[in-house]
Amino acid sequence: MVRLPPLDELAERWLVIAPMLLKATRRTGCYEPIDLLKGAMSGRYGIWVCESEAGIDAAVVTEIVDYPRKRILEMMFVGGGNMALWLPEAIRVFDEHASSAGCAHIACLGRRGWARAWGGAATGDVVVVRGLGDVQR
């Protein structure tokens, strides 16, 4: 089951969810899991859980972003395991969520494997990250 839990449940289960998001947040260094929880509590982010009978298998952080000409659902972070169990349902749930929120599409910044896992999704531009002072000439 893929769902957006109520905030009180999210807080109660945070000690299970936070470690799942840690590896993903460390890739960018821009967020820690607690930053995502604060954002969820303020209504900025959605932190979804992907569950099986064994408990929470994964967590997905989303944000609806309004640009001047379109609204998109950004998949910010995904962490956890057992992807084969929840990914097909997650694609359906997030497509429905994005559509009902008036989004034009879903976007994510992630490793290349996500394009394959997402099933036929096209990749866009390359994101170039350069630390200040790291210019090589």
Can you say where each PLM-predicted feature lies in the sequence?
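Active-site rim helix/loop that mediates acceptor-substrate recognition in acyltransferases
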Residues: R26-I47
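Conserved donor-binding loop and adjoining core beta-sheet/short helix segment
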Residues: S42-A84
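Acyl-donor binding region in acyl/amide transferases
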Residues: P68-G119
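Long, low-complexity, intrinsically disordered polar/charged segments
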Residues: L22-K23, R27-C30, P68-F77, V129-Q136
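Active-site/acyl-donor-binding loops of N-acyltransferases
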Residues: C108-R137
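Intrinsically disordered, low-complexity terminal regulatory regions
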Residues: V2, P19, K38-A40, M75
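Short amphipathic alpha-helix that is part of the acyltransferase structural core
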Residues: M1-Y31
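Generic structural motif
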Residues: M1-P5, V60, G120-A121
